Structures are given as structure tokens and as C-alpha cells.
């Protein structure tokens, strides 16, 4: 694993492959550029994770900055995201601003955190969310954990991915027909890796 701790700039290295019979491939060269993070954020709990760079990118683009305790930042990669948190980050990633509102119109408005209300209204107005039908009315359920299926629907609507033929993709059972198109669409553009998650995992919370 190439881990040039504290290094910046460009580098390259050349390699060959040798098979069991001693045949040597033509050399191949890999060139890399290591740039300093603009945000100054480096997560203490993401060392060695392939997702560390993506986590830092979220901070640099103002989408999400983890908790700062003392002089260290923590991304908390195992913490399950709430519906409100995911919708807010998804909208921020697409440069969709939160509405300046005090009330959302959802029946569970009182339980929606103040910071999430503007995002809830923006998401509703943009057709990104429609809420959950309950006996009391349509609820946003900002504090509930968001599942991978629900997240796929949100991202599909935000990205406006062209619908694909469902028969070409490994989508889910009849119980998840409501999200199958979104999942297949995201698989077609490599947002979700086809076959990576089981049906049960797609129903689990996003971390």
C-alpha cells in the first residue's frame, strides 16, 4: 500500500507482472498527485479507510464536517444517519439551499429539529421527498434512521437519473417495488455497486 505520510506533490512508479512461467509483461507506469486538503480537516477515526478522502471532500465542499473534540476531528463512520441529516447533506451536495421557514407543514413539525426544517421544505418543494402517510397526516420523520432504499430514492430524484430497464439490473423483491427503479438507476451510473448489498442490507440504516 502506497502511504507517503505527510508528503505533497507528484510521484510515479513503474511495475511489471510475471506469470508462473516467467513471462514478463510490458512495464506500466502509475502517476499520482498528492494535494493538501483545503479544509484542514483530517479525521482521527478514518485512518486507513478508503473512504477518508471522500469524507474530507464532504468537508471541503461544505456538505458535512464531523465533530471536533479538542484538536481532533471525528467522522463517526459507524453512526447511523437520520432522515433529516441525509436529506440536508444530499441537498447541500447539490447546492440546494434550505428554505427560511419556521414551520414545515408536516404533521410532525414539532419533532423536526430547527436546522432540518428548511431542508425538509426545500426537499418537498423539489419533489425529492413526499413524506410518510400516517393517521395524523403526512410526516417527515426527521429523526428516524434512513435506509439505503430510502437514500437511493432521494439521490435518484436529486440526480434525475434516466430510468433504465429493470430487467438488466439486480434489483429487489416485490416488497421493495417502490424503490426498485431508483436502485437500478443508481446502479447504472455506479452510485450503487450492483450486487454489493443484499435485500436486507438495503433495508438497513445508512452510516
Go through the PLM ranges and name each one:
Residues 56-61:
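Mature N-terminal segment immediately following signal peptide/propeptide cleavage
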Amino acid at each position: 500500500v502506497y502511504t507517503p505520510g505527510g508528503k505533497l506533490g507528484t510521484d510515479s512508479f513503474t511495475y511489471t507482472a510475471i506469470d508462473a512461467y516467467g513471462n514478463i509483461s510490458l512495464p506500466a507506469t502509475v502517476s499520482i498527485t498528492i494535494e493538501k486538503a483545503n479544509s484542514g480537516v483530517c479525521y482521527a477515526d478514518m485512518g486507513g479507510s478508503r473512504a477518508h478522502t471522500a469524507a474530507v471532500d464532504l468537508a471541503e465542499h461544505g456538505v458535512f464536517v464531523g465533530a471536533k473534540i479538542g484538536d481532533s476531528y471525528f467522522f463517526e463512520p459507524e453512526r447511523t444517519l437520520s432522515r433529516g441529516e441525509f436529506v440536508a447533506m444530499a441537498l447541500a451536495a447539490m447546492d440546494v439551499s434550505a428554505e427560511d421557514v419556521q414551520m414545515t407543514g408536516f404533521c410532525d413539525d414539532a419533532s423536526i429539529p430547527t436546522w432540518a426544517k428548511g431542508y425538509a421544505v426545500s426537499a418537498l418543494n423539489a419533489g425529492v421527498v413526499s413524506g410518510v402517510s400516517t393517521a395524523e397526516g403526512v410526516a417527515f420523520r426527521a429523526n428516524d434512521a434512513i435506509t439505503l432504499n430510502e437514500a437511493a430514492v432521494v439521490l435518484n430524484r436529486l440526480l434525475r437519473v434516466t430510468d433504465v430497464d429493470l430487467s438488466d439490473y439486480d434489483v429487489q423483491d416485490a416488497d421493495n417495488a417502490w424503490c426498485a427503479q431508483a436502485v437500478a438507476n443508481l446502479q447504472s451510473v455506479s452510485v450503487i455497486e450492483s450486487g454489493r448489498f443484499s435485500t436486507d442490507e438495503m433495508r438497513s440504516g445508512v452510516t
